């Protein structure tokens, strides 16, 4: 955490909201967070970098504090349910840590209708007693549409669903030929019969098994691909891999690593 000089020490951290209205400031390098009562949140938004002061530690328990300044907002877009009124609308966030509905002025609804799941871009974070304001930038679908709930999760966590063209082009070119340099220091098992145990729609075929006879005993081989041999550091493939450390398995789809 960062501490400012002066009579009252200010502590910088990340605000984590609770659906009941209070929250906590998480300070880097500190084991204990700071409890922020609802009346001391002062308009802070989930994920904001904030400055707070310690107001006490009643009964020797967890430190309590008050947010005195919002340093920066981290959340730019929110997924939620659009509710239309007469000449304006609101988006009710899926994530209940966003404690206020988002006001959508007339003309900023992008054609969304009542009951649509949408992505809203925040244009104002509001004040202590004022709602945040935003504009709809994407309509996911109606709340009752099949798959709308899963796609809302994808959008909420900003999961990458498409590979950039440059990455796809690089992927096509690598690994087609095995050079002598690739073989150096490795045991060549290309004449062994190996199988992968993956579904038909799997993309990351990076492991396989084999079964051979050795002195009247079965030898089970487990083979793991050395993917880094084919991915050059700081290439488009390498940068994309940094964003996709693991595959994401959802109810009706897989977003591959």
Model-based region annotation:
Residues 1-221, 228-257:
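Charge-lined substrate channels and their catalytic hotspots, especially those that engage the 3′ end
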């Amino acid at each position: 955490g960062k501490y400012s000089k002066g009579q009252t020490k200010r502590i910088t951290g990340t605000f984590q909201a609770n659906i009941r209205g209070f929250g906590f400031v998480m300070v880097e390098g500190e084991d204990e967070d700071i409890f922020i009562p609802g009346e001391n949140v002062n308009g802070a938004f989930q994920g904001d970098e904030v400055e707070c002061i310690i107001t006490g530690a009643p009964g020797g328990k967890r430190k309590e504090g008050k947010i005195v300044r919002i340093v920066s907002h981290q959340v730019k877009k929110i997924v939620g349910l659009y509710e239309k009124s007469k000449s304006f609308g609101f988006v009710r966030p899926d994530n209940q840590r966003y404690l206020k509905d988002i006001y959508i002025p007339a003309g900023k609804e992008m054609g969304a209708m009542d009951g649509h799941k949408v992505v809203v871009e925040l244009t104002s974070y509001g004040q202590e007693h004022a709602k945040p304001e935003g504009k709809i930038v994407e309509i996911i679908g109606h709340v009752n549409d099949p798959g709308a709930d899963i796609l809302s999760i994808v959008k909420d966590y900003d999961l990458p669903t498409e590979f950039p063209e440059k990455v796809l082009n690089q992927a096509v070119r690598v690994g087609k030929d095995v050079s002598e340099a690739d073989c150096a220091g490795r045991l060549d098992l290309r004449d062994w019969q190996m199988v992968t145990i993956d579904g038909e729609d799997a993309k990351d075929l990076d492991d396989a098994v084999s079964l051979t006879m050795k002195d009247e005993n079965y030898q089970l081989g487990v083979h793991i691909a050395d993917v880094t041999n084919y991915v050059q550091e700081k290439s488009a493939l390498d940068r994309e891999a940094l964003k996709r450390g693991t595959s994401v398995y959802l109810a009706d789809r897989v977003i591959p690593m």
